[in-house]
Design a protein with these regions (language model features):
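Active-site-adjacent beta-strand anchor residues
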Residues: 14, 90, 233-236, 268, ...
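ABC-family P-loop ATPase nucleotide-binding domain
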Residues: 1-12, 309-314
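Conserved protein kinase catalytic domain
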Residues: 75, 119, 222, 303-304
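C-terminal coupling/interaction segments
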Residues: 270-314
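ABC transporter nucleotide-binding domains
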Residues: 3-6, 13-209, 213-214
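Hydrophobic/anchoring residues in structured secondary elements
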Residues: 13, 255-258, 294
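ABC transporter nucleotide-binding domain
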Residues: 174-269
Length: 314
């Protein structure tokens, strides 16, 4: 069924001779999906294609069964927040949301209700009647998010939505995304801050130079490259020397290194599932294992493995 997915089929977009994105094929299910990559990797172009702000040079796009070339249909269920910090002059936060809703043809009473709810959801009730021009950077980011969620959309497309938010508001915003995902909606966000993506996402789309280099659940992507890049596990135990010795007996383990504090072992393996099963047997055999933590199944590590550590830190 494609009517509950965002579909891109061999989509490319060129700006003259400049590549925006090339050959992108994706099938995005409900949930939180993060587009990840440094500036210039194609994240914003991909969002503009999904929302119909730019047309593909080739390929086909469908958003829950609707083509982006049909904006009147598309924006009945799509909310989009760009990263551009521009607002109409003279409007308060409430007026900004209300006018946006009225322009979409909704009755005034419904617009007032939706405006109030959206402003409550982003925590701007006390600032609702202040001019947007007097807002801080973080408050302007939140009022843009309020505009996107005000129509109660089934699909949210958000370009760098956490940029400029303080830690408390960032946490509340992430909780809002997860709540939308739990309701079966799509939340597509872009980010170049990789540690945030681990907190937000069900799935990731890793981009570089206009190409999709990997996509899927982050741990699934990590598992796919474990033969080339063995997975790392941090194992805390009271007998690290014995554990390291036993780990080296496993044919899929390529390294077992004692930690500097001598209270654990860092193990690299080409078969994570087999290693976890082996740990269970070692524990039953008497090795006192206190904890096991994957050391490199996060977005930053995977992106660095696929693209290079220099790109991953941009």
């Amino acid at each position: 069924m494609n009517d509950d997915r965002i579909i891109l089929d061999n989509v490319s977009r060129f700006y003259g001779e400049v590549l925006g994105v090339n050959g992108v094929t994706l099938s995005i299910p409900p949930g939180v999906t993060s587009l990840v990559g440094p500036n210039g990797s194609g994240k914003t172009t991909l969002m503009n294609l999904i929302t119909g702000l730019v047309r593909p040079s080739r390929g086909r796009i469908s958003v829950l069964g609707v083509e982006p070339s049909q904006p009147q249909r598309l924006f009945r269920f799509v909310g989009y927040s760009t990263q551009f910090d521009a607002f109409p002059k003279g409007l308060t936060g409430s007026q900004f949301i209300y006018c946006f809703l009225r322009f979409s043809g909704r009755p005034a009473a419904e617009c007032r209700k939706l405006t109030t709810r959206a402003i409550e959801q982003v925590g701007l009730v006390e600032a609702a009647d202040r001019k947007v021009a007097a807002y801080s950077k973080g408050m302007r980011q939140r009022i843009r998010l309020a505009q996107a969620i005000a129509p109660d959309p089934r699909v949210l497309i958000l370009d760098e939505p956490l940029n400029g938010l303080d830690p408390l508001v960032r946490s509340e915003t992430i909780a809002l995304f997860k709540r939308y995902a739990a309701e079966g909606r799509h939340v597509v966000v872009s980010s170049h801050v990789l540690h945030e993506v681990d907190m937000i996402s069900d799935r990731v789309v890793l981009m570089s130079g206009g190409y999709v280099v990997a996509e899927g659940p982050i741990r699934g992507v990590r598992s796919e490259i474990q033969e080339e890049r063995p997975m790392q596990f941090l194992v805390r135990c009271r007998q690290p020397n014995l554990l390291a010795s036993r780990a080296f007996e496993l044919d899929h383990v390529v390294e077992a290194r004692l930690l500097p504090d001598s209270e654990g072992v860092l193990v690299k393996t080409r078969d994570a599932d087999a290693f976890c099963r082996a740990l269970n047997h070692l524990a039953l055999a008497g090795i006192d294992i206190e904890g096991v933590v994957p050391a490199d199944d996060n977005v930053h590590s995977v992106y660095a493995y696929l693209i290079g550590s220099e790109e991953a830190t941009k």
